[in-house]
Amino acid sequence: GLGDVYKRQTLATAESCTGGSIAARFTAMPGASAYFLCGVVAYSNESKNNLLGVDPETIASRGAVSEEVARQMAEGARRITGADYAVATTGIAGPAGGTEQKPVGTVWMAVAGPHRTVTLLKQCGTDRGQVIDRASAFALALLRDEIERDAAGE
C-alpha cells in the first residue's frame, strides 16, 4: 500500500499552492506519527524565504512558480526537519494569477532526498480544487517514485 512505501522513511512537506493538502494526506494514514515529521505551508514569498531559506533573488528572477523555487523549498524543508525526504509544491491554483507563460494550473514540484533533488512540471487543470488535488497526487507519486528508486539502489 501507499503508506508502506512511506513508512520506511521520514518525510516533510513544503507546500504553497497545495495549501497543506499533501500533509493532510499523510496525517490521514494510520501510523503517520512514525514517519511524518513536519508540514510547512509557505504561501507568501516572505515565508518561503524565512521558513525554508528560499533565496529572494531566485524568486525575483525566476518567479515563485519556478523549478528553482520548488527545488529550494524541498531542500529547505529537508534541511530544517532532518527528514529523509521532503516534497514541495509551488504553482498557480487560480482562478486568477495565470499568465501566458504560466497559466492557471501550472505547478512545479520537487522531492529532495538523500542522494538528489528531482523536479517535475505539471499542468493540473483550471479549477482551483482540481489543481490542488492533482498537484498533491502528482507530488506524492514523485515522492513514491524517488523512495522506490533509492530502495532499488538506482
Residue spans of the language-model regions?
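Glycine-rich phosphate-binding loop
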Residues: G1
